[in-house]
């Protein structure tokens, strides 16, 4: 009898957990009445993974590349013991530092009826030239340029890449602009439909997981990688990389053509060197839209 009651309790617990996951998934992008000041609890989307660490607690395995997490300890040979474990840990341990340069596209024509019509303005082309010159002046050996497949990002990339000859370019849909997660606090001037958070959020999170992580264990030298994309994507990535609440992304502001520099150490520690730097541009060339 006691065993049957235990099974019933366990079943209730599982059902409750499923309901909680379902609720959190539905809560993303849920329309609300009221103005900017309306309080609400922040609900992480279901695709964001498990429970977050407590405030101020750093998750060392945030990218799921902590060496110990890559080893199946249950398959460890009992006879070889700690020696074999140490060897495997060394095999999976990162050695290099990754430098991630996140570039926001330059100013573009916002009134284009189609995405392909939203090309860079003359000022936007000047901004891209200035950003390219700034990157070239750093004297770094850039490994690659990954860019969004949207027109304004492609045009920004084409101009910047002229200042970085020989650096390969890769286009991806993952970095396209979108609504990553419902912002907190909410704002009245920007309210996408719930389905947009559902579709864009998972894609932008996939971009973060695909591109933002510690170096592969086989990488011997530090790398310098450029990602040319959009304000929402960059702000979300910065919050996720620093393990700040991702729903706070809209509290940050980025100028067109700005440079954000993230550093990912071999031990998984992340540092933000610069956020939205446009100090290399004359004041009359700086815009945010």
From Swiss-Prot:
Record's keyword annotation contains Metal-binding: no
Residue intervals annotated with topology Mitochondrial intermembrane: 30-289
Residues passing through the membrane, by range: 7-29
Effect caused by changing residue 80 to A: Loss of interaction with KEAP1
Mitochondrial matrix side: 1-6
Record-listed E.C. numbers: 3.1.3.16
GO molecular function, one term: protein serine/threonine phosphatase activity
Domain notes: The N-terminal 35 amino acids, including the potential transmembrane alpha-helix, function as a non-cleaved mitochondrial targeting sequence that targets the protein to the cytosolic side of the outer mitochondrial membrane.
Name of protein: Serine/threonine-protein phosphatase PGAM5, mitochondrial
